[in-house]
Every structure is written in structure tokens, then in C-alpha cells.
């Protein structure tokens, strides 16, 4: 279980990997800058570097982060929030994505801020409004749903 008592508004990578089942190269949250579990809010960060393997093919002469991976990063940040709102013996996994829109490209060197605000939480899962921002401008947005499953299923 994650101890939020030391700094209740931030999580480091060690705390993140204790919550999320993802690992390199698919762990897309580097830090949680702010989290308020009671209010249902999270602000996380992904540092986008040219070393990301997906830039080799997307696209070699004009690298941009694939939109589906931006959504995955948002889902991982949201999954942290939903998990911390839920029962400790379960994990929040992606259920659905609705109203996804991509507003601007995300490029190597960008700092991607992943913002999630709770729309609904229950004992079965949750739903968030999510925004990915670069330089305080929306790069992508969506509503993301989660369901709880036993950790043994992952």
C-alpha cells in the first residue's frame, strides 16, 4: 500500500510502480505532481524524450507521440487516482475511452502534464475527465472509465 502521509500531494516513481502494474517500456507516468484523493484530482507528468522507441517509426523525420499512447498515459494517471479511491486489494484497469480529441502534437522534449478529475467513483470502478497538456495547452482530452479487478488477474 502507498503511504501518502509524508507528502500527500505527490508520488515518486517507486510509489507509482507500487500502484500500477505497468513497467518499462509501457510505464508512461514519471511523477505525480499533485493528488487529492478525496476531491478526485490528479496531476501527473510524463517527460517525452527522443529515446522513446515509438519515435523510430512515428515518424522518423517528424517524430510525434502516438495519440493512443497519450490516451494510455492519461489512463495510467487516472488509474492511480481511481485505485487510491477504491478497495486496496483491487486494481483499476481501463474499461473505456469516450469523446477522445487530439488538439496538438506531442514531440520529443515536451513535458506532458496528465490531469484527471473524477466524474464518478463507486465500488466497481470510476470515470474521469482527462486532459493532456503541453505548455498549458490541451494536446488531448477524453473521458476514461475504469473497472476494478483482483490483482491476481493482472
Curated annotation (Swiss-Prot):
Keywords: Cytoplasm, Lipid A biosynthesis, Lipid biosynthesis, Lipid metabolism, Lyase. Its EC number is 4.2.1.59. It is an enzyme of class 4 (lyase). One of its GO terms (cellular component) is membrane. It is found in: Cytoplasm. GO terms for biological process: fatty acid biosynthetic process; lipid A biosynthetic process. It catalyses: a (3R)-hydroxyacyl-[ACP] = a (2E)-enoyl-[ACP] + H2O. GO terms for molecular function: (3R)-hydroxyacyl-[acyl-carrier-protein] dehydratase activity. It comes from the Bacteria. The active site is at 58. Involved in unsaturated fatty acids biosynthesis. Catalyzes the dehydration of short chain beta-hydroxyacyl-ACPs and long chain saturated and unsaturated beta-hydroxyacyl-ACPs. NCBIfam families: fabZ, PRK00006.1. Belongs to the thioester dehydratase family. FabZ subfamily. This is 3-hydroxyacyl-[acyl-carrier-protein] dehydratase FabZ. It comes from Protochlamydia amoebophila (strain UWE25). The lineage of its organism: Bacteria, Pseudomonadati, Chlamydiota, Chlamydiia, Parachlamydiales.
Amino acid at each position: 500500500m502507498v503511504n501518502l502521509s509524508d507528502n500527500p500531494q505527490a508520488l515518486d516513481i517507486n510509489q507509482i510502480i507500487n500502484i500500477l502494474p505497468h513497467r518499462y517500456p509501457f510505464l508512461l507516468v514519471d511523477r505525480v505532481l499533485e493528488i487529492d484523493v478525496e476531491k478526485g484530482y490528479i496531476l501527473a507528468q510524463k517527460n517525452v524524450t527522443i529515446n522513446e522507441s515509438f519515435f523510430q517509426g512515428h515518424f522518423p523525420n517528424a517524430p510525434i507521440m502516438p495519440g493512443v499512447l497519450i490516451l494510455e498515459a492519461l489512463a495510467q494517471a487516472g488509474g492511480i487516482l481511481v485505485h487510491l479511491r477504491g478497495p486496496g486489494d483491487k486494481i483499476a484497469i481501463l474499461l473505456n475511452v469516450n469523446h477522445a480529441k487530439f488538439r496538438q502534437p506531442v514531440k520529443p522534449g515536451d513535458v506532458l502534464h496528465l490531469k484527471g478529475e473524477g466524474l464518478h467513483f463507486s465500488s466497481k470502478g470510476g470515470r474521469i475527465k482527462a486532459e493532456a497538456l503541453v505548455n498549458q495547452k490541451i494536446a488531448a482530452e477524453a473521458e476514461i472509465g475504469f473497472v476494478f479487478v483482483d490483482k491476481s488477474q493482472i
